[in-house]
């Protein structure tokens, strides 16, 4: 078939008429300076606060400073090859991370990309990293417990679902160990866990992940990682990314627990970004909004009511409340809790667990100082049996601390004082607990009952540990149904009291330790 010139020209005209040029308008700017992960861009007139800016090489920066003729942005990722004169453009989007059940059991970076070598993440959607916390009307009071598995914490400093409880102490006092054991104890509780590691060594995080896997808790946990070698921007954003992943469960009528390990390093990363952006420094060179940095994060941990969940899920989930419980960690310098960041976070949270290096070095682990540790709202969430049995423990320890200080100067003590000192020493010994060995409510209750009712009076101090181990082995073998009943109901009445008394009487009469 041959075409003449007229037909060819007609075909060309038809094609030209059909051709549709799609014009895409985008806001483009030019990098005018690059320094330590912070870039200054000229020409982005319509840029939003917190907007993602597309950089060459499939990377992004986040706009944090909007000035008269330029935009200051932090680069999320490597920045060594960025140079002045490079073209960048606005995306019109704010930062979002993948959320959903598919992230459980995975290790991801701040942007939600997998770093565990197990293939792509199967997410249910994306959520904005920055979100407004639920309002007062959407919240419900805290009245259900989160069991950490530690006798010292669950008895004296109880934590409720939706609470923010600070874990504070010097380095090497067992802060991360306490948080990891709390995650391990949620294996069978139905609470989903998120562990956010900020500014830590990759080897340390690898150990944590391995321990969670060994104890069967990784399948229930999302690990969000921003290592010490990553940019300050990623360390600053990691807690918000982890929080968005936790809110997915909270807003669908489920319970979640999030650990921020630790917020001191996030504050340092934010200080670095702020100083590079030339924001005015304040106390300890932190910027003026460092309080807001943590308050807007921790206020997102809440117990939300059934109406909120129903409205959020558009009626799919009815009659269920959701919660996100936060355990932020703060590292102090030489026990100074009056420094800027520690005082900020203490004032934001609903209580704190204070870990002391003196107690840790004395072999009292967990090194909880019950004198200045407090839970402001957890008491309402404590199980009935723990509430009944733990009151005397706190009193005994308070009296012991007072008398121990006094007894250093007094040589002759009366019998009542000696008994109080002896009881205090034994309770302190009883509250010691090994790492990765969380205890159930029933086991804790039995041990506290023994201390409360004077069953330790004739047990030598050195044998308290073996007494406890033998007692727990005895009840697991011969009284498993009662333990199960206490674990399920958490109740306390005359019948349960009588049974516990009977168990301890028969144990002391027939068993050795």
Swiss-Prot record:
Q: What is its EC number?
A: 7.1.2.2
Task: Please list the residues that bind ATP.
Answer: 169-176
Question: Where does the protein principally reside?
Answer: membrane
Recorded GO molecular functions are: ADP binding; ATP binding; proton-transporting ATP synthase activity, rotational mechanism
Q: Which BP terms in the Gene Ontology apply to this protein?
A: proton motive force-driven ATP synthesis
Q: Where is this site: Required for activity?
A: 373
What keywords sit in the KW lines?
A: ATP synthesis, ATP-binding, Cell inner membrane, Cell membrane, CF(1), Hydrogen ion transport, Ion transport, Membrane, Nucleotide-binding, Translocase, Transport
Reaction(s) this enzyme catalyzes, per UniProt: ATP + H2O + 4 H(+)(in) = ADP + phosphate + 5 H(+)(out)
Localisation per UniProt entry: Cell inner membrane
GO cellular component term, pick one:
proton-transporting ATP synthase complex
Which topology term describes how it sits in the membrane?
A: Peripheral membrane protein
Q: Does the keyword Transport apply?
A: yes
NCBIfam families named in the record:
atpA, PRK13343.1
Membership in a protein family: Belongs to the ATPase alpha/beta chains family.
Assembly, per entry: F-type ATPases have 2 components, CF(1) - the catalytic core - and CF(0) - the membrane proton channel. CF(1) has five subunits: alpha(3), beta(3), gamma(1), delta(1), epsilon(1). CF(0) has three main subunits: a(1), b(2) and c(9-12). The alpha and beta chains form an alternating ring which encloses part of the gamma chain. CF(1) is attached to CF(0) by a central stalk formed by the gamma and epsilon chains, while a peripheral stalk is formed by the delta and b chains.
Q: Its biological function?
A: Produces ATP from ADP in the presence of a proton gradient across the membrane. The alpha chain is a regulatory subunit.
Protein name in UniProt: ATP synthase subunit alpha
């Amino acid at each position: 078939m041959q075409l003449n010139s007229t037909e060819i020209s007609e075909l060309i005209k038809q094609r030209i008429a059909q051709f549709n040029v799609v014009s895409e308008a985008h806001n483009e700017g030019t990098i005018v300076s690059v320094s330590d992960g912070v870039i200054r861009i000229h020409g982005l007139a319509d840029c939003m606060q917190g907007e993602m800016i597309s950089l060459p090489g499939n990377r992004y920066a986040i706009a944090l400073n909007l000035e008269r003729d330029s935009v200051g942005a932090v680069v999320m990722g490597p920045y060594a090859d960025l140079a002045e004169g490079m073209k960048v453009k606005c995306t019109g989007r704010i930062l979002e991370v993948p959320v959903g059940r598919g992230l459980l059991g995975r290790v991801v970076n701040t942007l939600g990309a997998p770093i565990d070598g197990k293939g792509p993440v199967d997410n249910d959607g994306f959520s904005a990293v920055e979100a407004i916390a639920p309002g007062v009307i959407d919240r419900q009071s805290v009245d259900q417990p989160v069991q950490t598995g530690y006798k010292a914490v669950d008895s004296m400093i109880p934590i409720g679902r939706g609470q923010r409880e600070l874990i504070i102490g010097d380095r090497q006092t067992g802060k991360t160990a306490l948080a990891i054991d709390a995650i391990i104890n949620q294996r069978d509780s139905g609470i989903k866990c998120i562990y956010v590691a900020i500014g830590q060594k990759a080897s340390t995080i690898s150990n944590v992940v391995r321990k969670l896997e060994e104890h069967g808790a990784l399948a229930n946990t999302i690990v969000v990682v921003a290592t010490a070698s990553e940019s300050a921007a990623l360390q600053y954003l990691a807690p918000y990314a982890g929080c968005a992943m936790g809110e997915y469960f909270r807003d669908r009528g489920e319970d979640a627990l999030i650990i921020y390990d630790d917020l001191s390093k996030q504050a340092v990363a934010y200080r670095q970004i702020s100083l590079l952006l030339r924001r005015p420094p304040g106390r300890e060179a932190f910027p003026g909004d460092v309080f807001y940095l943590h308050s807007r994060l921790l206020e997102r941990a809440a117990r939300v009511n059934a109406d909120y969940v129903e409205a959020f899920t558009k009626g799919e989930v009815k009659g269920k409340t959701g919660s996100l419980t936060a355990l932020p960690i703060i590292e102090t310098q030489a026990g100074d809790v009056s420094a800027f960041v520690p005082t900020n976070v203490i004032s934001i949270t609903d209580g704190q667990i204070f870990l002391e290096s003196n107690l840790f070095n004395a072999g009292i682990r967990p090194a909880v100082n019950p004198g200045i540790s407090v839970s402001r709202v957890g008491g309402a969430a404590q199980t009935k049996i723990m509430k009944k049995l733990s009151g005397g423990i706190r009193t005994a320890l308070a009296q012991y601390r007072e008398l121990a200080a006094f007894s250093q100067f007094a040589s002759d003590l009366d019998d009542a004082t000696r008994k109080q000192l002896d009881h205090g020493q034994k309770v302190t010994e009883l509250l010691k607990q090994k790492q990765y060995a969380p205890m159930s409510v029933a086991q804790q209750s039995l041990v506290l009952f023994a201390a409360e009712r004077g069953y330790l009076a004739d047990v030598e101090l050195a044998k308290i540990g073996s007494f406890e181990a033998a007692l727990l082995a005895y009840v697991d073998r011969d009284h498993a149904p009662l333990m199960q009943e206490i674990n399920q109901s958490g109740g306390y009445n005359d019948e349960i009291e009588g049974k516990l008394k009977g168990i301890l009487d028969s144990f002391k009469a027939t068993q050795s330790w």
